[in-house]
Amino acid sequence: MLKNDLFLRALKRQPCSRTPIWVMRQAGRYLPEYRAIREKTDFLTLCKTPELAAEVTIQPVELMGVDAAIIFSDILVVNEAMGMDVEIIETKGIKLSPPIRSQVDIDRLSVPDVHDKLGYVLDAIRLTKKELDNRVPLIGFSGAAWTLFTYAVEGGGSKNYAFAKKMMFRDPKMAHMLLSKISSVISDYVCAQVEAGADAIQIFDSWASALSEDDYREFALPYIKENVQALKTKYPDIPVIVFSKDCNTILEDIAATGCDAVGLGWGIDIAKARTILGDRVCLQGNMDPTVLYGTPEKIKAEAGKILKQFGQHTANSGHVFNLGHGILPDVDPANLKLLVEFVKEESAKYH
């Protein structure tokens, strides 16, 4: 039994004594303890060494007191498992080769056995679960098909997604073929993470805001829905969070994927999101990550405002406090610790 199951209770919209908190990228460069490990190894080796991945996954639980751990990995491990060469240089960016821009390229990508090609992530989950010893839940995750598609077609990050959109608009059938292939791997991967011990899954659609509402409905949401349904068919009790970055205008469509929680960017007042969605899903978010550069007073004021905007909890409401995107690498860890402690203390009165 979990000693602290607040995060899972909130996702399932069950009564909680306070609002749980974790933050995206909580295992990362802002922590000196993480940097000490990273100095000895490169990023992908860290992802692929279960003992090290488990160690950095647990660091924020022990150092910051967050209510959930998220497995240390990267969304691009899926692209690599499908046969792409992935280079991640933390300060310089990402390169994937060869870029996928033709039918021949798509055919060349494999649909791997995730237990084989992504076994190191599953091993890291098993080891982390053991070392967490039921202190807090463990989140598994994957990138969404649209985001992994853009990386595959662009061959890296992009400002305007020209190659990805060219394929979408010139040959939508080919685009859907690639999206579908990626999506099938994601479905297998998230199910395998749950088999290995993940207590919840988050799907990250980091480049969601690159698409118009209609294009998002056509090229992104159907695949997220496919992934959620694949997981729910096998593991109906495992909660799923969908984080479609900055898609604040189509929250109802995101909720309609069947997810348990919708991750919010900081561009929307959480009260407005709750009005739109009612309490049919849990809401996760949504403080601007740069607030953590502020004074202790400012951090508390902003966090307090979000808790107040969400308002009083009902018998079937859910809120997981988080940032609207990942914590930035040059944030003072003391500021995150202050945020975590403040949310734990301040949120109780709303429950």
UniProtKB/Swiss-Prot annotation:
Primary location class: cytoplasm
Top-rank EC class of the record's enzyme: lyase
Residues where substrate binds: 25-29, 74, 151, 206, 325
NCBIfam families registered for this protein in UniProt: hemE
GO MF terms held by the record: uroporphyrinogen decarboxylase activity
Marked site (Transition state stabilizer) residue numbers: 74
Metabolic or biological pathway: Porphyrin-containing compound metabolism; protoporphyrin-IX biosynthesis; coproporphyrinogen-III from 5-aminolevulinate: step 4/4
Signal peptide: none
Cellular component terms per the entry's GO annotation: cytosol
Subcellular location: Cytoplasm
GO BP: protoporphyrinogen IX biosynthetic process
Official protein name in the record: Uroporphyrinogen decarboxylase
Catalysed transformations (reactions): uroporphyrinogen III + 4 H(+) = coproporphyrinogen III + 4 CO2
PANTHER family tied to this protein: METHYLTETRAHYDROFOLATE:HOMOCYSTEINE METHYLTRANSFERASE RELATED, UROPORPHYRINOGEN DECARBOXYLASE
EC number(s) recorded for this UniProt protein: 4.1.1.37
Pfam family, one: URO-D
Keywords: Cytoplasm, Decarboxylase, Lyase, Porphyrin biosynthesis
Assembly information from the UniProt record: Homodimer.
Similarity-based family: Belongs to the uroporphyrinogen decarboxylase family.
Domain of life: Bacteria
The organism's taxonomic lineage, starting at the top: Bacteria, Pseudomonadati, Chlorobiota, Chlorobiia, Chlorobiales
Function: Catalyzes the decarboxylation of four acetate groups of uroporphyrinogen-III to yield coproporphyrinogen-III.
